[in-house]
């Protein structure tokens, strides 16, 4: 995804190709998200007791998702599509701010800055790709535009250093968690829709 040459009007990419691109992109986003979490953890979070404070504190916790792979297998593909779209949209705003605020970290590693910007851009590309998939799988379907609103910007900008580092830690942790869910659901959908569960 970018799916079509710029300016092309009647460009139609096949569903298997759209899924291939989306799965590659979601896998890459999850890989970048994991890298960022580990880099942040190593440099800023060790010994600060963030783990017990972070339980159930993602802004997307209100989006009810399957508990495990078995539950995901039992979930209708339209529901999984809506979950993916909801999660991706829920990250647009926080990723924007993460990319612009991460430079304020003391001695922010350049790799962290680069990856934060890249994840922001790739998340938007993936969202556009999933919207194209939905158009092909359910043409004319009324799309669910629901997503979770993030209100964590003041925490990323607070002068309380411990609270600020925890806000970054939690955002990286939740991003890693949600990018893994998106990647898993997409792979499951690709298997189900493109290969008729023969994979």
Swiss-Prot record:
Q: Do the record's keywords include DNA-binding?
A: no
Q: What's one GO BP annotation on this UniProt entry?
A: positive regulation of lactation
Subcellular location, record wording: Secreted
Note the Pfam families from the entry. Hormone_1 (PF00103)
**What cystine linkages occur within this chain?**
4-11, 58-174, 191-199
Q: What is its main location?
A: secreted
Q: Which Gene3D superfamilies match?
A: 1.20.1250.10
Q: Which UniProt keywords apply?
A: Disulfide bond, Hormone, Lactation, Phosphoprotein, Secreted
A Gene Ontology MF term for this entry? hormone activity
| GO cellular component, as recorded | extracellular space
* UniProt cross-references to InterPro entries, sorted A to Z: 4_helix_cytokine-like_core (IPR009079), Somatotropin/Prolactin (IPR001400), Somatotropin_CS (IPR018116)
| Residues recorded as bearing Phosphoserine in the entry | 26, 34, 90
Sequence similarity: Belongs to the somatotropin/prolactin family.
* Assembly behavior: Interacts with PRLR.
Briefly state the protein's biological role: Prolactin acts primarily on the mammary gland by promoting lactation.
Which PANTHER family does this UniProt record tie to the protein? PROLACTIN (PTHR11417:SF5), SOMATOTROPIN,PROLACTIN (PTHR11417)
Mind telling me what this protein is named? Answer: Prolactin
Q: Which organism is it from?
A: Loxodonta africana
């Amino acid at each position: 995804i970018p799916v079509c040459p710029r300016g092309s009007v009647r460009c139609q990419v096949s569903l298997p190709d759209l899924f291939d691109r989306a799965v590659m992109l979601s896998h890459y986003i999850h890989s970048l998200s994991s890298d960022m979490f580990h880099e942040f953890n190593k440099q800023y979070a060790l010994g600060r007791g963030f783990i017990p404070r972070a339980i159930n504190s993602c802004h997307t916790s209100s989006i009810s998702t399957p508990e495990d792979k078995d539950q995901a297998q039992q979930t209708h593909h339209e529901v999984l599509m809506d979950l993916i779209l909801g999660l991706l949209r829920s990250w647009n705003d926080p990723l924007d701010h993460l990319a612009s605020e991460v430079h304020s970290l003391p001695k922010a590693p350049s790799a962290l800055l680069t990856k934060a910007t890249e994840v922001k851009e790739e998340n938007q590309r993936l969202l556009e790709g999933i919207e194209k998939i939905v158009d092909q799988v359910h043409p004319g379907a009324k799309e669910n535009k629901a997503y979770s609103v993030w209100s964590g910007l003041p925490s990323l900008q607070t002068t309380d250093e411990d609270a600020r580092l925890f806000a970054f830690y939690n955002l990286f942790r939740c991003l890693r968690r949600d990018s893994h869910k998106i990647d898993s659901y997409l792979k499951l959908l690709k298997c189900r829709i493109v290969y008729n569960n023969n994979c």
